[in-house]
């Protein structure tokens, strides 16, 4: 089960191309200037099963998937289960936004989720580093990480670091 605040279909702001973005409840980072402070409460939204979420994802054949929130890493076990199902039944790519740094994701559930992701946008939003020209992130401390390459190489490998708008 995942506690979900909202699902946006065919959005284009949470990664490249059209995406189905799943916004979860719960975040302890509480970054000043957060664009989604209503997501901080862990009891917000409603619980949804992997099957319910997978149906929504499959029913949008052209959209890839983004996990956001809140912070999906607080519900890593549920998102890992969903990501495994997405991998099994689709060829969609999976992005995830988190306020945690990649290097701090050491809980077994978080590592299991990481193994299913294509890209992780990591780090807290820092208002003094806000930059509207950054693609797919709000502040310059946040990184867009190629997760499979990073796990393979044992260090952070950035995803297409030359990208800007």
Language-model regions, residue ranges each:
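N-terminal [4Fe-4S]-dependent radical SAM core
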Residues: 1-23, 32, 36-42, 156-157, ...
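Conserved Radical SAM active-site core
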Residues: 2-5, 18, 36-96, 100-113
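Conserved C-terminal portion of the radical SAM core fold
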Residues: 61-68, 93, 121-127, 151-165
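P-loop/Walker A phosphate-binding loop and immediately adjacent motor/lid segment at beta-alpha junctions
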Residues: 75-84, 90, 130-165
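Short Gly/Pro-enriched loop/turn and capping motifs at secondary-structure junctions
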Residues: 101-103, 125-128
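Short, hinge-like loop/turn segments at secondary-structure boundaries
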Residues: 112-115, 138-140
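Receiver (REC) domain switch/active-site residues of two-component response regulators
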Residues: 118
């Amino acid at each position: 089960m995942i506690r979900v605040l909202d699902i946006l279909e065919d959005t284009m702001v949470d990664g490249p191309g059209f995406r189905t973005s799943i916004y979860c409840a719960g975040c302890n980072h509480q970054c000043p200037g957060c664009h989604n402070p209503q997501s901080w409460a862990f009891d917000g939204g409603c619980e949804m099963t992997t099957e319910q979420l997978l149906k929504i994802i499959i029913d949008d054949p052209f959209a890839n998937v983004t996990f956001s929130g809140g912070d999906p890493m607080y519900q890593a076990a549920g998102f890992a289960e969903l990501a495994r199902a997405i991998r099994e039944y689709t060829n969609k790519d999976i992005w995830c936004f988190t306020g945690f740094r990649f290097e701090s994701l050491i809980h077994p559930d978080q590592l299991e989720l990481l193994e299913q992701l294509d890209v992780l946008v990591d780090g807290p939003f820092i208002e003094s580093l806000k930059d509207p020209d950054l693609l797919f992130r709000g502040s310059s401390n946040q990184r867009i990480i190629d997760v499979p390459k990073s796990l393979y190489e044992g260090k952070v490998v950035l995803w297409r670091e030359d990208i800007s708008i």
